[in-house]
């Protein structure tokens, strides 16, 4: 699925309050979880020890770090939309209301559903707030929900 392309921020502004779209499904592999553990130093057994997690964890196996799931949002967003004009730089400004309603099991697939909540002009940039739900394939609960704040500089 190709991303929705906006020629400028004004075109994006027309979608305030509406769902923009969904990303492609993305596999959360054990190798990715291992790399994230190495990069962050978070080596809890629930993420890395498949045998122990199968026996002792309430999830029946290893799970992705919540922060790994959260960090995938910027990657998944590339599948959803692209702004081609009037923006030289997009900066991750922060997050609101981050929650992890369900664990993302290793080897499961996730995708992002994105809604534009707000887009406002600031003195030196524009600020967008997106509601992002990271869905887990074959799960009733999402792996992550968050409001993502992005600043766009001309």
Report the location of each language-model feature.
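Hydrophobic beta-strand-centered segment that forms part of the acyl-chain substrate-binding groove
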Residues: 57-64, 71-113
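Generic structural detector for well-ordered beta-strands
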Residues: 21, 25-27, 99, 149-151
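Catalytic strand-loop segment that frames the active site of acyl-thioester-processing enzymes
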Residues: 2-64
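Predominant activation on well-ordered alpha-helical scaffold segments within soluble catalytic domains
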Residues: 34-37, 70-74
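HotDog/MaoC-like acyl-thioester-processing domains
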Residues: 1-15, 100-154
């Amino acid at each position: 699925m190709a991303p929705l392309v906006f020629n400028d921020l004004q075109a994006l502004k027309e979608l305030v309050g509406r769902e923009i779209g969904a990303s492609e499904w993305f596999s959360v592999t054990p190798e990715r979880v291992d790399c994230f553990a190495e990069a962050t130093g978070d080596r809890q057994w629930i993420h890395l020890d498949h045998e122990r997690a199968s026996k002792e964890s309430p999830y029946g196996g290893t799970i992705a770090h919540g922060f790994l799931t959260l960090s995938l949002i910027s990657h998944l967003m590339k599948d959803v939309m692209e702004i081609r004009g009037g923006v030289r730089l997009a900066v991750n400004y922060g997050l609101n209301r981050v929650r992890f309603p369900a664990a993302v099991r290793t080897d499961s697939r996730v995708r992002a559903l994105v809604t534009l909540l707000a887009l406002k002009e600031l003195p030196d940039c524009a600020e967008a707030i997106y509601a992002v739900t990271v869905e887990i394939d074959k799960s009733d609960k999402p792996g992550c929900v968050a409001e993502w704040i992005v600043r766009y500089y001309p």
